[in-house]
Swiss-Prot record:
Origin organism lineage: Bacteria, Pseudomonadati, Thermodesulfobacteriota, Desulfuromonadia, Geobacterales
Chain sites annotated for binding Zn(2+): 13, 16, 35, 38
Ligand binding (ATP): 119-126
Protein name as catalogued: ATP-dependent Clp protease ATP-binding subunit ClpX
Keywords, ordered alphabetically: ATP-binding, Chaperone, Metal-binding, Nucleotide-binding, Zinc
Similarity remark: Belongs to the ClpX chaperone family.
SMART domains named in the record: AAA, ClpB_D2-small, zf-C4_ClpX
Subunit record text: Component of the ClpX-ClpP complex. Forms a hexameric ring that, in the presence of ATP, binds to fourteen ClpP subunits assembled into a disk-like structure with a central cavity, resembling the structure of eukaryotic proteasomes.
Amino acid sequence: MSRRDDRSDNLICSFCGKSQEEVKKLIAGPTVYICDECIELCNDIIAEESKLEEATGPDVKKLPKPLEIKDVLDEYVIGQKQAKKVLAVAVYNHYKRIEAMTKPGEVEMQKSNILLLGPTGSGKTLLAQTLARILKVPFAMADATNLTEAGYVGEDVENIILNLLQAADYDVERAQKGIIYIDEIDKIARKSDSPSITRDVSGEGVQQALLKIIEGTVASVPPKGGRKHPQQEFLKVDTTNILFICGGAFAGLENIIQQRIGVKTLGFGADVKKKIEKKAGELLIGVTPEDLLKFGFIPEFVGRLPVLASLTELDEEAMVQILKEPKNALVKQYQKLFDMEHVKLKFTDGSLVAIAREALKRKTGARGLRSILENAMLDIMYEIPSQTMVKEVVISEDVIYNKEKPIIVYESVAESA
């Protein structure tokens, strides 16, 4: 293909034939030239094909296997090995089920929505977000404490679907294969395990309202959010293939499990029940649907969340790993910020342990790590951009425990010359 215009000896684009004078940029290859306009057109075509691929949901042939899904989860979430395996298998089977439903005569497979149980800051939300990122599907989050049943002041359950629709850029097809994470689901348990005879606006009533969209229905979603009104146009979204992941700390559930697994003993003067002392996280691993019923969930709601995954409380070692090992680890993020100022940032091992211990003391789990770091780093991040000749900043445990200033290493005159 010609690279020059024979008449004017001008360089031309090998694809559209425009000369270098007609375009902003002409990029040379081994035997051809391509202009900026053709590059932009190619990018548009690739973007459109990518959107089309996402609209149909993950291709089962290209769907990561459970082992591969867990490997990627390991890059972002520390620990929780069993929960990751449960999630990887459940998500893989969910999208295989969608593929099977498109084939006539196939066995009808029930949807496997997921219930995550674990203390605050153990990684429930991060696991759900990472799953959506791996599968390249729209993702939305909702807080169960804000939900009310229809007719009461609060957020309608349909607004959860609206959030997913917004994440999918109002592409209904894409939204219908997305993932919704509902946090604080334990807060909508009714106050006792006996049926309610009065209105429970934020408890059993919300469970009933969530039932339909979780099991699969065509929801009428107001495109602008808020309350429905007769003059408003509705978007129809089928929730049959939306994967729902619900999460909560379930404080007090361990007591119900403890009572169930208590060992009865016989004999004069013996205890009626001998309690087996275990950590709450260890007890949650053995949770059963019956325990959830006693906690305050209605049978139909428990039945719609057949996959149970328990997360354990993070210890000091896990907290330190979270600070430095994941792809998006906080230490790496701060080091990148300092790198942009051409300054090396170093955390001593003692400082990482101090941060972890402070987070454990606050009982906020991994989510408390950032606020501790922000407080410790505020002054130095304020000063460094205005300083010259700074080579390295060292964060020691004294910075965390005693609010001392970080160690600043300056360049020598010889180095700066």
